[in-house]
Amino acid sequence: MKNHIDLNRAIIRGEAGRKVLWQPRIICWYDDRKFNNTPLPAPYTGMSIRELYEALGCSNRIYDYNYAVELIEPSDIKRWTEPVDEMRTRHVVQTPQGTITAITRRNSSNYGEYFEKWWVEDQEDLEVQMYIEANQDYRFSQEKYDEVYRLWGENGLGSIYFPRTTVQSLYHDTMGIEGGVYALMDMPDAIEEYFKIKQANHDRFINMIRSSCFEWINFGDNIHCGTLPPSLFEKYVLPDSLHRNELPHQKDKRYYTFAHWAADPRS
């Protein structure tokens, strides 16, 4: 069984020479076949996902380590889910500030799901979301980290992802792209207040990471020029990233970026 962790460490420290770590996203193909009850082809039939990676001699980008981060909320924030129909689920968060809901729809061809209704649709919803994020904290769970390590072992180095920066999180987590763009234009003062709360929330997340055993830390944003023009990038994403970079770094941790570009990265 090959130790990919050592090569992973050597690469991020610039000590690997010309060696390359192969990390294909085979897990997506594996999960789709599992969802559809389609056996793996020979000679991989019956293998677990870990066994498949080992048989191919490749490493996994182990996103599972994000489960080692536990969200902490006060008792006056209550969450529950309820079925809407066979394919849809309603998610509810009740707070002293009010209640917000979201609806997600499952895919018919894989384990994925997507928002059909976003958490925040107007300023009243946004005030509830601000209350939620202002009162959240984070805790590293060594127990959950060890569970993931038992699954993947030395197949790859565990990494953790910072939350998306303010405007990116607005698009991906809270309002969706269309709702987020309208909110930036229609209620800029409320959005600015929300972003201050969100940044403080993210700082608590980052401070939690600094005290954890994670060595490899991703800045965790996707940059899509179609929804993030230079004006918004320069106003929100760049200052937020610079702020994160100014937080104290530690010699036992390495930081890296990952971006999906919707345009020529040289532009």
Question: What do these predicted ranges mean?
Answer:
Residues D31-I77:
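Segments that shape or occlude catalytic/ligand-binding pockets
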Residues D76-W80, T95-P96:
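Long, low-complexity intrinsically disordered regulatory regions enriched in P/S/T/G and acidic residues
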